[in-house]
């Protein structure tokens, strides 16, 4: 149990979103640390599941192989495998809570000469539990959230850790423990403090995001000044922390209590910026001539995006491809009956999107039950001209490479992409459920 937080075990794994909004609204996060480590998040998830009896409704060690919707039966047939044996389950609805990472393989990147390297090459997604990197020289290739998390945690034991990045990222330091949150917990009732803290963490990131998008140059200078103040004199902002894009064109990296910058100032960590020319038996050489000696190379170059967890999806035996279809109100998929994807936000805590999705699905189920409907299918109306838009409005490398795997958003109507939790929550609770939606009455067979 725990998904990413159980499967990913690299050193220092933690959230890069605050747990006050990343956690469940019905079971508020109570720890003092707003950015939590993987083990704490895993424990929190298990406690929530036990407290509300969710764990008693989970079939563990079951792998979903395929899911087929039958128009005749008005239900799904799901093929699963457990202990080497296959069986089927039937249900009216499917909620795809599989995340959006490929947990079988990482994102493939071309690193020239990597096959020449005689040391260990490790992807953070598949970190060996028995890896001893004490007094080793480690090169971490990448500049995203995983690399920023790894650097200070590896530097504690390694002889030297060098971050090798093709292009820089914005890194923002935040307090590990929020003093204002602690004051609220000290002087206010628990329920009130939890609500106020959650609202604070809902509003401040949203305001900052909109400032970044409205005043990009101001935001860029602001964040760069913050990074410059934290960097040691030996490391300059340019070129190592001078991205070619403005804040929130790609997701910002965060580090708790300056741990990333402190590791750079300790002398145990360093940073090299430039394209890799080649990898030798024991080093990385950049096009600018820098040589990074290494016993271990960590390829923190991004994650491969995948929806549906490798399950084959079909409607009446006809294969269904996520990438060929539009997303209805961020929840359901065009032409796919009684099914939803749990999708979050690039500019806020992912689980806020899951919360909005859950609200929408519960409301849809009640609407169908009260009207005696057996199926709901989002439809693009005949003659409706939609212009495709990206589901995630970021230009990060792993997002760009995933365009062929993600469904599409549209430019109008219920097909527009999600951007704002408050808007989506209102739509989920009060919005129109019938717009571009075909409902099938119980007892009426119909080809879908």
Located regions from the model:
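Feature captures the FAD/FMN-dependent oxidoreductase FAD-binding
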Residues: 34-102, 264, 278
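Short beta-strand to alpha-helix junction loop
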Residues: 29-50, 59, 141, 211-220, ...
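Rossmann-like dinucleotide-binding core of oxidoreductases
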Residues: 97-236, 269, 292, 343-393
């Amino acid at each position: 149990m725990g998904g990413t937080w159980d499967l990913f075990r690299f050193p220092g794994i933690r959230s890069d979103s605050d747990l006050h909004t990343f956690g469940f609204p019905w079971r508020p996060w109570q720890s003092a640390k707003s950015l939590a480590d993987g083990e704490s998040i895993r424990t929190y998830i298990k406690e929530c599941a036990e407290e509300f009896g969710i764990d008693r409704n989970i079939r563990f060690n079951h792998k979903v192989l395929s899911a087929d919707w039958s128009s005749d039966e008005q239900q799904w047939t799901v093929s699963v495998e457990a202990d080497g044996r296959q069986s089927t389950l039937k249900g009216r609805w499917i909620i795809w809570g599989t995340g959006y990472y490929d947990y079988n393989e990482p994102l493939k990147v071309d690193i020239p000469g990597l096959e020449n390297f005689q040391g260990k090459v490790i992807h953070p997604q598949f970190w060996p539990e028995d890896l001893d990197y004490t007094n080793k020289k480690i090169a971490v290739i990448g500049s995203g959230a995983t690399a920023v998390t790894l650097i200070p945690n590896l530097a504690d034991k390694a002889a030297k850790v060098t971050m090798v990045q093709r292009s820089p990222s914005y890194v923002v330091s935040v307090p590990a423990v929020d003093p204002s949150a602690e004051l609220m917990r000290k002087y206010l009732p628990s329920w009130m403090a939890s609500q106020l803290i959650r609202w604070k963490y809902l509003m401040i990131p949203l305001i900052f995001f909109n400032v970044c998008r409205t005043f990009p140059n101001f935001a860029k200078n602001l964040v760069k000044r913050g990074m410059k103040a934290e960097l040691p004199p030996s490391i300059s902002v340019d070129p190592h922390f001078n991205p070619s894009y403005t804040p929130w064109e790609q997701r910002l990296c965060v580090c708790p209590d300056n741990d990333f910058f402190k590791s750079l100032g300790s002398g145990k960590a360093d940073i090299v910026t430039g394209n890799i020319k080649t990898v030798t038996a024991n080093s990385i050489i950049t096009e600018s001539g820098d040589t990074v000696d290494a016993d271990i190379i960590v390829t923190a170059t991004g994650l491969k995006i995948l929806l549906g967890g490798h399950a084959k999806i079909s409607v009446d035996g006809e294969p269904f491809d996520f990438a060929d279809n539009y997303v209805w109100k961020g929840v359901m998929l065009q032409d796919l009956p009684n099914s939803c994807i749990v999708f979050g936000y690039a500019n806020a805590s992912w689980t806020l999107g899951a919360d909005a999705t859950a609200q929408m699905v519960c409301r849809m189920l009640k609407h169908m039950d009260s009207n005696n409907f057996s199926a709901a299918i989002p439809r693009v109306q005949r003659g409706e001209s939609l212009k495709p838009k990206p589901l995630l409005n970021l230009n990060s490398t792993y997002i760009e490479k995933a365009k062929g795997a993600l469904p599409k958003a549209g430019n109008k109507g219920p097909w527009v992409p999600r951007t704002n939790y408050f808007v989506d929550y209102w739509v989920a609770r009060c919005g129109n459920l019938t717009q571009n939606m075909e409902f099938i009455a119980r007892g009426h067979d119909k080809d879908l």
